[in-house]
């Protein structure tokens, strides 16, 4: 009774035993994971299970599985949402908030430092050389991610394959991402697999696209209209990241490059490369993009706006997830959205490859990256990116001077 414990009765009626760890211990664990956790969302989720469920036994396997299911069901980067949910299990809103910040903060600070270096030294040969190699390797990495996601999530379902191929085509042709197609895909699968009564009676509603805000302004450190625009755009982007953080890439490209012209193609590919060489969630690349657009304020606004939907989509439904999370309509909706997101990722690989594969050496580097990742399953992306950077440092000066 001497140490206060948070209430532990869930909305679903189950009662957790008192936690065997302090909130400080949990926050420090996620601070360390955010600093050293390379390998992408699947690897990060695996680390959490290994450490928190198996080794430390702070979290039960049932709670972990519920968090993983919610992270797959709701919009938001999988690893960040799972971390937030695990913080919520015993320490509710305070735990979810502190864990979320601790998990994201290390990689955010890293991309800020890389953003400063990119702006400060971007015109120098060595910086151009690094990204010459890394940009090509990133194409190979994303291609393998798209392949694995397609194989795992689309499977043999003909309707999901239809949605997937439509989104690939739309992304390649328009070189942008139409947000409402994600929702339309989810509703289509929902209505097909688990149609509501009113639909079976022959009634149908129409769906309308929600346009993105118009582009405006030049870069300015404290340009409030620009910062507001950044906030609105990245909040929308954060709301359409299903499963893998890579799902945000085509959406960002459509807004940041094609519509708003905040960055050019090369800068955008470099931003994706930064996400690959830093630990923590891939989505943190938004901090790098925000820094290039509007300095430190832009980085802070972009990161906060992107992760706010992730946080809300985890904390708000958490008490009710046990009761409603396995409804056929919800599961069908998520399958549709996931197929659409993976199709957009695959289309983005093609779009970005046209910008990053500029000659025979970069084409070979991308192909070698794909071959290595297929051959050596445990080979980490940061190792590949580091090797590509070294190749770029050697090859770029020889080929361009």
UniProtKB/Swiss-Prot annotation:
It holds the Pfam family Chromate_transp. Induction: By chromate; induction increases when cells are grown in the presence of high sulfate concentrations (3 mM SO4(2-)). One of its GO terms (biological process) is response to chromate. The keyword Cell inner membrane applies. Its main location: membrane. The chain crosses the membrane at residues 26-46, 67-87, 93-113, 124-144, 172-192, 214-234, 237-257, 272-294, 299-321, 330-350, 356-376, 379-399. The keyword Transmembrane applies. InterPro entries: Chr_Tranpt_l_chain, CHR_Transporter, Chromate_transpt. It is found in: Cell inner membrane. This protein reduces chromate accumulation and is essential for chromate resistance. PANTHER family: CHROMATE TRANSPORT PROTEIN-RELATED, CHROMATE TRANSPORTER. Belongs to the chromate ion transporter (CHR) (TC 2.A.51) family. This is Chromate transport protein. It comes from Cupriavidus metallidurans (strain ATCC 43123 / DSM 2839 / NBRC 102507 / CH34). The lineage of its organism: Bacteria, Pseudomonadati, Pseudomonadota, Betaproteobacteria, Burkholderiales.
